[in-house]
């Protein structure tokens, strides 16, 4: 059932894209001939003008063409495929109101992205909800409930490939009437370990399905999907000035392993970075080590990892985007634990053909799918790889639409330049400036401080060389950032005290405690919060875990430690004068005096005061 793409057809598709591109700037939502109900929803959501990917993709999609689009996260890719699918469904329902069939399938690599896509569909169907039904199969419900949801033949399904195959196997889902297939973040779907599911799905879907492949990068994995599902697709490569690091100031700091914590403390306590920050770390333990460390100094932060319930993860991202939280500590587990292994490429494609394909499609991979020295991999990452299946459908460095992120802090450097590009893509979006700061451990410093050591830091220097090379090709510079270490060293003893409190046992307790707390918030209260949405705002995810020994004095910075510039930055000019004596009367003391005047609290008259020392009688022997 595999539908291989004829190599001769690819250039003609790209020519078609060039023709469409001429009129793209003049396109408006009014000119796209969308259903009035969809246009009304767009107005409600304040969509005024289509983005480049929308203006190019929607007309082509309405003509029934397969589309392979390269556009960055946050460029409007979701609306580019959701709107034409909804338009087609509404047209079919207008012709036959009794029609009940699943005609659209949207595949995504992670649960977070599935929830995000479902949210967009809900907004666009605000005025046609009775005519269009959509279901998110990644929700944490029983198989019986999911079977009931599918029994009514929803028009549109959002899911990971694994959930689709599971429901196909149990006959709960039928794809006989499928007309639209979308694979969002296509380059990740295969590298997240869904290769077997994708192959099974290619055999299950009917011929002639219109396919959308959406990705931030066009890699060999996307080429594999194109061969499986597409028929002479139109290739849209949207070269945006903001793409892949433009507008982002990139800095790197060479430091020892324990100095990562020292510099992080100084950055946040002295407020060297203004705005929202995402801290990327290697695994879940590192998440809680950094969180507990920052707690010692009264710095609040949220943790985001695959152990937390999906509802909690989604709520954290939503509240972060609203500005409720300023710091998120995210575990980029898929990247570090090796779950992003490359898809087994077809043996029919030779190395030369593959390289030619990458050049054609603008691959962002720089021959660095694995950490350096594959034959010298440490045993530690291999052990972690066993647990990677648990977070298979979790991913935070790609796909999720973080908004107004001022800085990405690579606390642990990723193992590939591709992952680095995806991480820094969380900032500097929508024309705004952003900053990426990465900590790099020199080879001679690796392993010197075992409590804070992380296995992948062994490859930091070689990975950095690839990152610099990759960014140079894109005309971006990775600059060294130098801290004034004489001033920073003044904080070292405080960092050492705090780090000593964050033991392995404290980290385990913190993990267990937060999971218990989030499970209560996520599961038991889910329905309550659906009925009372205002109370959901009261839920906080940045509370202190208090698993480590708290030292209150660390929350205060003495003036003698503060550099003169930093003292001005932190101290507020508007703080009023606070005297040594209290000017206003004490409320309780005032009440006592009033009561005494009324006779309350007085001792009965005639009772003489007794001096216990004068009335003390020595007992007889």
Swiss-Prot record:
Residues 1-30, 342-393, 581-621 are annotated as: Disordered. Keywords: ATP-binding, Helicase, Hydrolase, Nucleotide-binding, Nucleus, Ribosome biogenesis, RNA-binding, rRNA processing. It is found in: Nucleus, Nucleolus. It catalyses: ATP + H2O = ADP + phosphate + H(+). InterPro entries: DEAD/DEAH_box_helicase_dom, DEAD_box_RNA_helicase, Helicase_ATP-bd, Helicase_C-like, P-loop_NTPase, RNA_helicase_DEAD_Q_motif. One of its GO terms (cellular component) is cytosol. SUPFAM superfamilies: P-loop containing nucleoside triphosphate hydrolases (SSF52540). It is an enzyme of class 3 (hydrolase). Its EC number is 3.6.4.13. ATP binds at residues 71-78. Residues 247-489 form the Helicase C-terminal domain. A motif (DEAD box) lies at residues 184-187. Pfam families: DEAD, Helicase_C. Residues 58-236 form the Helicase ATP-binding domain. Residues 16-25 have a biased composition (Basic and acidic residues). Residues 364-373 have a biased composition (Acidic residues). Gene3D superfamilies: P-loop containing nucleotide triphosphate hydrolases. Residues 589-606 have a biased composition (Basic residues). The keyword Hydrolase applies. GO terms for molecular function: ATP binding; ATP hydrolysis activity; DNA helicase activity; DNA/RNA helicase activity; RNA binding; RNA helicase activity. SMART domains: DEXDc, HELICc. One of its GO terms (biological process) is maturation of LSU-rRNA from tricistronic rRNA transcript (SSU-rRNA, 5.8S rRNA, LSU-rRNA). Belongs to the DEAD box helicase family. DDX56/DBP9 subfamily. ATP-binding RNA helicase involved in the biogenesis of 60S ribosomal subunits and is required for the normal formation of 25S and 5.8S rRNAs. This is ATP-dependent RNA helicase dbp9. It comes from Aspergillus clavatus (strain ATCC 1007 / CBS 513.65 / DSM 816 / NCTC 3887 / NRRL 1 / QM 1276 / 107).
